[in-house]
């Protein structure tokens, strides 16, 4: 299993880091079999697998539950777990307690926090306490309720400079890596070159040190539309729907199950059960 020191070495050598967001045992198992470097258990599970319209309702217990499943499916892969909405915006002590609970109960190797500002101090204190932290800048889904959209961030000079400053701040605070989401590729390249820690891009161009996409987006499973930055590697939904429809139809028509799908009992045992005729 790769560790932060390995990710630093990969950045240094130019080898790209692969991260996939997964939420359960079978998807994590697939990800590990594909030899991805990291798994992110994102609070996006709220929308992708729990059916919420945002990440806001996701709880610590949700994150622990899904991370434990991921760990069982990918025991040899570095796992990062999101700290959900408002679990790191109270006191430092509350933040440390919440991170401790996630790491101890789920087995996550690191936690991810969105944003900068007051979050920078939380990253520093978590690092001091021994909890590895991945930062997340650019489009931060937990704050969409305030910003009102999932549009590209940091397109103006002022916003771009602020993002660069924030990236340097979270690095100085001890973050082991930074997710850069939905920012101009030129800015992502500048940030990547300015930092000694790895950058993991999603909708941030090719020059970041690594890339992350959601498992469901990659394989086309249960999604209504793909974002611009998502490449369609498969479309599993096209296979799933007709398969389920065929099953329902065959049961109704009594063409499933066939004899070959059934178990049998020896004739002698049947006679013993029902009596000899």
From Swiss-Prot:
Coiled coil: none
CDD domains linked: KPHMT-like (cd06557)
Entry EC number(s): 2.1.2.11
Organism from which the protein derives: Listeria welshimeri serovar 6b (strain ATCC 35897 / DSM 20650 / CCUG 15529 / CIP 8149 / NCTC 11857 / SLCC 5334 / V8)
Gene Ontology terms, MF aspect: 3-methyl-2-oxobutanoate hydroxymethyltransferase activity; magnesium ion binding
UniProt KW keywords: Cytoplasm, Magnesium, Metal-binding, Pantothenate biosynthesis, Transferase
Active site: 181
Protein's UniProt name: 3-methyl-2-oxobutanoate hydroxymethyltransferase
Protein family membership: Belongs to the PanB family.
């Amino acid at each position: 299993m790769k560790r932060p020191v390995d990710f630093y070495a990969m950045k240094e050598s130019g080898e790209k880091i692969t991260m996939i967001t997964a939420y359960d045992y079978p998807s994590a198992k697939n990800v590990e079999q594909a030899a991805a470097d990291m798994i992110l258990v994102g609070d996006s599970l709220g929308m992708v697998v729990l059916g919420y319209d945002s990440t806001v309702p996701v709880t610590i217990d949700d994150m622990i539950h899904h991370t434990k499943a991921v760990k069982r499916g990918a025991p040899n892969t570095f796992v990062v777990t999101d700290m959900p909405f408002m679990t790191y915006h109270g006191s430092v002590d509350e933040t440390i307690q919440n991170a401790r609970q996630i790491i101890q109960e789920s087995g996550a190797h690191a936690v991810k926090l969105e944003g900068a500002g007051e979050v920078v101090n939380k990253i520093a204190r978590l690092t001091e306490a021994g909890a590895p932290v991945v930062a997340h800048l650019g489009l931060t889904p937990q704050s969409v309720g305030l910003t009102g959209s999932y549009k590209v961030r940091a397109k103006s000079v002022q916003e771009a400079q602020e993002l660069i400053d924030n990236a340097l701040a979270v690095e100085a605070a001890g973050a082991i890596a930074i997710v850069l989401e939905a920012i101009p590729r030129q800015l992502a390249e500048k940030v990547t070159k300015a930092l000694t820690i790895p950058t993991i891009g999603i909708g941030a161009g090719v020059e970041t040190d690594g890339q992350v996409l959601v498992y469901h987006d990659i394989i086309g499973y249960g999604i209504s539309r793909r974002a611009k930055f998502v490449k369609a590697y498969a479309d599993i939904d096209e296979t799933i729907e007709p398969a389920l429809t065929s099953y329902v139809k065959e049961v109704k028509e009594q063409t499933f199950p066939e004899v070959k799908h059934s178990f049998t009992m020896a004739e002698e045992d049947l006679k013993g059960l029902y009596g000899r005729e």
